C-alpha cells in the first residue's frame, strides 16, 4: 500500500508538471524573442519567433546592416534610431529599401526600435507605415513614437508602477483596436520613496534587491493589478520605501494576463526571457 501511495503521488506530481509546462507553452506561443548578435542563432534554435536587431540608418541617410552575425531568414527585422547628426535623409527611399530587405530575408515583420520622438523619426515612421502596409508586412513601433500612425502595431511596455496592467491594455485596445496593440515584456526593479513624486523609482539590480531584502527582512507580496511583486521597508532615516520588481513567476503571470486580454504578440529580450521557456514552480 505504501508503494501504491508513493507511485500515486509521483503520478500526481508528474501530471502537475505537465500541466504547468503546457500552460507556459500556451502563454508563450506568441512570445517573440528580441536578439542581437550571436544570441539570434541560439534563440532561433528554440523554435521561437525571433526579432533580430540588425539594421540601422547611416549618417548619410541610407539603410545599413549593423555589424552582427549573418542575418537569419524568417526573423523579424529590427531597425534602430537614425543618428542625430544625420546629413540627409529620404524617408521614402529608406522605406523602400526596408521593404526590399524584409522581402529578401522573408521577414514576417519589421520592428522600428525608435526611442526618440523627433521630427525626423516621425517622417521616417510615417514612410515606413505606408510602405510596409502596402507591402502587407506588419510594422511594430513603440507606443510613445507610433501613436499617430495609421497602420502600425503599437508595442506597449508592461513596466507600469500604478493602476492595473489589464485595464491599461484594455483601454488602449478600445482606442486603437485589439489587433493594433502588442506588448513588450519589460521587467521592472525599482525602489520608490513614499509618497513618490514621480512614476519612476531608482533602478535596482537583482543582486542589490536581494541584499536589501536580506538586510531589511521585508516580506514580498504579489500585486495582481500591477502583476508584479513588491515589499516595503524603512531606511535608517525613517523614510518609507516601496520596492516593485519582476521575476520569472511574475513575467509568466504577465504573459497570462496579456493572453487573457487577447494580445497577439509579446516581445521580450533574450536571454533575459530564458526563464519563461521552462515551467514555473
Annotate each PLM feature:
Residues 1, 9-24:
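Short, Lys/Arg-enriched N-terminal segments with co-localized hydrophobic residues
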